[in-house]
Amino acid sequence: MTTTKRPIALLILDGWGYRENTHMNAIFHAKTPVLDRLNAQYPHGLISGSGLDVGLPDGQMGNSEVGHINLGSGRIVYQELTRISKAISDHEFETNPALCDAVDSAINAGGAVHIMGLLSPGGVHSHEEHIEAMCRMAVARGATKVYLHAFLDGRDTPPRSAKASLSHFDDLFTTLGHGRVASIIGRYFAMDRDNRWDRVSQAYELITQGKAKFQYDNAVTALEAAYARDENDEFVSSSAITDVDGKVATLQDGDALIFMNFRADRARQITRSFIHPDFDGFERAVVPKMHFVTLTEYAGDITAPIAYPSENLVNTLGEVLQNRGRTQLRISETEKYAHVTFFFNGGKEEPFEGEDRILINSPKVATYDLQPEMSSTELTDKLVAAIESTKYDVIICNYPNGDMVGHTGNFDAAVKACEAVDTCIGRVVEALAKVGGECIITADHGNAEQMTDETTGQAHTAHTSELVPFIFVGRDATIDKGGKLSDVAPTILQLIGETIPAEMKGKPLIHIKE
């Protein structure tokens, strides 16, 4: 057997895809001398991070949560989007016990069924087809008061694309004979994940008190007014929608509130504001005693009923390393810290034995195009120190820049973001060379390689379905073609001389030349 090297570092360049078309391709236009040199010098290829290869529907773009679950578990994990869509088409959804209990409790109390979530066909945090199924199910079970609190996207969808969704739901409620859109607000407020409670509080007050910056009698009118104020979907101010009598619909005691987002990271904060008795993120004027249900599992400390609990993943990379007595480090900025820990560990919150974690605070700026380098220098300082300490067998690091700046739609800033990451990789590779370590450089999904929508000409702020890079900076080796994210964990185990558990269905991609 070949002697192994340590540490092996996995560098995940978030939102860094490969695209032939160079138009508005921030990765192509960025000056990346380090990656250019590594590509010229070391074995490299492209692997898949989207669609069926990561357990999403065919053609569906990848995302960070899905990417890290596949990277860390070494198998294709069928995602909540796919699971729930299947439950709807199989008619299992309409008899889901947690959802039925919520609707029935509201009906029996003479209350309303409130449904909140990201109203979007994006499929990253939610899918509007799931929200539609929930509205239909509530009415079918006898609910006459059904209120939709719509969070608007513009990030995993074009920046101004919510009108079609809102119009569709207006028509749906007309057809059903009950229900209406009760409020709209941008995801920037409702779905913050960086403890910016001043944002979340606006969504909370909108739903619980009808307290809004604006009030309209129709959701589409509210959206058009937001566009006139130059607010894209993501940033739409809190807008309450009144009924024919000019009344707003607020969450009351005895009501049910069903949160239809299936992705956890941006659902946690607002959920805690609704259900934690000792919540202190902001002052809550009212705390309705209601029946709260989450579509999926958001966090260990969130004890609400769950419609679709997580599937238990055993023998993920982290667990195998623990069981074999290996040491590991997880490191990233705030924005992607959950991804290299919770998601990489298959949805487990607690660190494994021998697993250290380093969290670097992301900069407190309104949007990351204002600071495209983010906290990459500080992150790299800590990463280099960890490498040089020779304390770890395996290091998992995520650089968020390509994704977080890619989401702003600002091409020049995205170029700077890529250049900042390239500089950091240079320092990491140098540190690894010093201690005889190796690294794999890859990504979880694409984003920054496409900064404009070729059809509409609007900024492209969403992820892509492009292949992502896979570079091995280490011993002389060959790389298999046609790999996917789930092949990365088995590859790492093979490189450090550990056997691959049966649960990992991925295949090692790197073959060291003897």
UniProtKB/Swiss-Prot annotation:
Reaction equation(s) it catalyzes: (2R)-2-phosphoglycerate = (2R)-3-phosphoglycerate
GO terms, molecular function: manganese ion binding; phosphoglycerate mutase activity
Gene3D superfamilies, A to Z: Alkaline Phosphatase, subunit A, BPG-independent phosphoglycerate mutase, domain B
Pfam family, one: Metalloenzyme
SS bond partners: none
Cofactor remark: Binds 2 manganese ions per subunit.
Catalytic residues of the enzyme: S64 (phosphoserine intermediate)
EC number: 5.4.2.12
Positions bound to Mn(2+) 1: D403, H407, H463
Enzyme class: isomerase
Signal peptide: none
Binding site for substrate: H125, R155, D156, R187, R193, R263, A264, D265, R266, K336
Cofactors (names): Mn(2+)
Keywords: Glycolysis, Isomerase, Manganese, Metal-binding
Keyword ATP-binding: no
Keyword Transmembrane: no
Pathway: Carbohydrate degradation; glycolysis; pyruvate from D-glyceraldehyde 3-phosphate: step 3/5
Any one Gene Ontology BP term: glucose catabolic process
Function (record text): Catalyzes the interconversion of 2-phosphoglycerate and 3-phosphoglycerate.
Family in the record: Belongs to the BPG-independent phosphoglycerate mutase family.
Subunit structure: Monomer.
Name used for this protein in its record: 2,3-bisphosphoglycerate-independent phosphoglycerate mutase
UniProt organism field: Shewanella sp. (strain W3-18-1)
